A protein has these predicted regions:
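Extracellular/periplasmic catalytic domains that process cell-envelope and extracellular macromolecules
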Residues: 35, 47-50, 63-66, 106-111, ...
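Structural recognition of the beta-strand scaffold that forms the well-ordered cores
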Residues: 40-45, 52-57, 69-73, 79-83, ...
Length: 262
């Protein structure tokens, strides 16, 4: 599939402007309207301030239970505005070209694409309206500080650091929304009942790096060679398209992280 992704990437454009949340969701809803139902929009949860968290499922049809399922997730961190734009622009390109572009068509013949462009809607709104470099959600913590880092609130090697990682794994409605999406929406069950996700990319800025797990230990992952090969190919394609050099490394080489989504 690398060749098809390479061909598809030649035509994706990123808008120079950043949209407010209502405009982002108008674009998300527009995917369903313009795709003949092949892009489906779901509200997978609500934020701490009761804003919708939306997901999009793009497929050739609605009965592709045996296909690999890939999730692209953006805006864990409020201030990283480009992280919603990349997956959303990818989704728009796929929908616009699913019938006319053979490379896009082939990808959808072999996979189902899920997207959550804005996992942290409250933080995103706050970063636009109040504090540009705000990172967290808008949880009022027991010590009256504000905000939990959503990408430290998963159950993968979770570690409490005051309240910035939450009071426990999945203490935040935003991460619960992703967890429940994985439990309830992906088609193929694991042995433990959790649904099978075949690939996951989370988008962040800044840094020009492609990181792969694990982040909580310096020991290599069981599939570290595969992860490195995949990440290196992504970096190669990025360089060939725009001349930007992206570093490839295991997350923990940069620094140790606990409770990350990946």
């Amino acid at each position: 599939a690398f060749g098809n992704v390479e061909k598809m990437s030649e035509n994706i454009e990123i808008t120079p402007d950043y949209y407010d949340l209502d405009q982002i969701y108008e674009r998300v809803d527009g995917l369903e309207k313009s795709s003949g139902g092949r892009a489906q929009v779901f509200v997978i949860g609500r934020s701490i301030e009761d804003r919708e968290i939306k997901a999009v499922r793009i497929s050739k049809n609605n009965s592709d239970a045996d296909l690999p399922e890939i999730l692209l997730a953006g805006t864990h961190h409020a201030r990283e505005w480009i992280s919603y734009e990349v997956p959303l622009s990818i989704a728009e390109f796929i929908v616009e070209n699913m019938d006319s572009n053979p490379y896009v068509s082939d990808i959808l013949e072999r996979s189902v694409i899920w997207l959550v462009p804005v996992l942290n809607p409250d933080g995103y709104v706050y970063s636009r309206d109040q504090e540009r470099y705000w990172r967290y959600n808008r949880r009022i913590n027991p010590d009256m500080t504000v905000g939990v880092d959503l990408n430290r609130n998963y159950d993968s090697s979770w570690m409490q650091v005051e309240y910035v990682h939450g009071t426990g794994p999945f203490s935040e409605p935003e991460t619960v929304a992703i967890r429940d999406l994985m439990k309830n929406s992906f088609e193929k069950p694991f042995e433990n009942g959790i649904k099978s996700l075949d690939g996951l990319i989370t988008y962040h800025s800044y840094g020009q790096m492609i990181l792969y797990p694990p982040g909580s230990t310096n020991d290599p992952a069981e599939k570290s060679e595969y992860y490195n090969e995949l990440a290196s190919k992504m970096a190669e394609l990025t360089f060939s398209e725009c001349g930007s050099v992206y570093l490839v490394m295991q997350t923990s080489v940069l620094y140790l992280t606990f409770g990350e989504m990946t």
